[in-house]
Amino acid sequence: GGIICGYNSEEVVLNHVDVAYAGATPTESSASFQNKLFKTTIDGGVPAFHFCNVNGKFVMANSFFHDNYNDQTYFTGGNGVIINNIFADSGNAADGGEAINVKAGCKLDVANNIIYNACTNAFKLSNAGNSEVIPLSEMTVYNNTIINCGWRRSKNKKGGSVWVEKAAKPVFVNNLIYDSRFGLKQPKKDGADMEHSRLTPNYYFASTETGVAQMAKDAELGIWFDTDIKSSVAGQLN
């Protein structure tokens, strides 16, 4: 399993912790399953850290999350700061796995993290789950380094570095996306709230022609900004 917080969890601080090899499928005897937290059926893994209290607070700082079988983090509520962490080797080829997966109900400040080899995305930013009691998320994501993400997912429809959907409106600026499978992407329908988002400037580097092509202006589902800095040929701007 992982660190699965309850609906009444008020405050969590993860500082200088090492969380690894979490995310296995829960059993009927698992505390999270018995309390209907995150999973109500025995049908897949759980994140290494899950927080869900819209009115709660959490801090993740100076920590190392690695080799976790599913998402490293999954947030369906909470006011949080995620700073100075390393997220490495999340997910598995069949099911995928994000480093930071955000749904509705969150207010987050995310900065100065290194994300390496996420199976699918470093960031999946969404407003799924929004309701009368669960507000739209507010996310400020800056000064993060995203390396080599997306390549391990065997069925990759949802990006390879950053995926924005369901009217999410993040501030996502001054991040480095290095040798990841795709650039910033959104679905054809129900994508980002482009009017209220700020998604540029960011820096995108690719050392291969495949990487260049998959983050180019005409890349499928890609979000392009002329104000970004991007490799137009392999190895440019290293």
Protein language model regions, located:
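Extracellular beta-rich repeat passengers
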Residues: 1-238
